[in-house]
Amino acid sequence: KNERSGVEIQLDRSDFNFPTLVLGNFVNIIIISSRFIAGADGSNSIAFFMYAVVILNVLLTSVIGNVSTILLRKISIKKNTRLMIYSLLISLCIGLLMVVGLHYFSYDIIKFVYLRGEFNLFDVHETSSYLLELSFSFLFLFIATTLFQPFLTLPIGETKRVRLKMVVFFLLSIAFAAIYSEFNSFTSKESAVFVMYFSSINAVFLAFYSYIKYDQYEK
């Protein structure tokens, strides 16, 4: 029981449904998969990738994460299409501002944040290049993160099949991107960027599909 309210929360095995865990952490799965690809050749590319992702992920978790939390809280009580549209527009605007800002200031940002100790100007250049090239993929992740929230409020038991199909498609898209980049002799950087973009674009399609399912369920 909760000591303050005295309310007992009942947990069921379905609350730990694997597809739900995957869909709820799709951003981390995409980043980890791309990170693995970035370091596949044993070069420093993985370090530059992670330095860039740290900065992009801060914006994702601090701004888009809060927007999604508010949206999730509201629509779990009552369907609110207007709030959904507002949240999506906020995510889109923030993402576009980020892309434009990084186009002009990615080098300066990396230099200000990381240029110290062993981190030299070459590292600044390589990391800022990653930062700029990954920015659009994070714009897609911003959109997908917002769009997924309504679907995740639906009862797991009644949407289990849909969740499983979405997860299978999502994981296969990552596997396909990794295999495709491997057989096309991409550099580690090109492979990591390709996996990020291919997976994040597929995540947007899945997120739109999930919202359609949510809308059908709520009618």
Segments from the language model and where they lie:
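Interfacial segments at transmembrane-helix termini and the short loops linking adjacent helices
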Residues: 105-139, 189, 193
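Transmembrane helical elements of multi-pass membrane transporters/channels
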Residues: 7-72
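Hydrophobic alpha-helical segments of multi-pass membrane transport proteins
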Residues: 140-147, 199-218
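Helix-loop junctions and terminal segments of transmembrane helices
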Residues: 61-79, 148-153
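Interfacial transmembrane-helix starts/ends
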Residues: 50, 71, 79-96, 101, ...
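Membrane-interface junctions at transmembrane-helix termini in multi-pass inner-membrane proteins
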Residues: 136-165
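Membrane-interface helix-loop junctions in multi-pass transport and translocation proteins
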Residues: 1, 160, 169-205
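N-terminal membrane topogenesis motif
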Residues: 1-20, 127, 157, 213-219
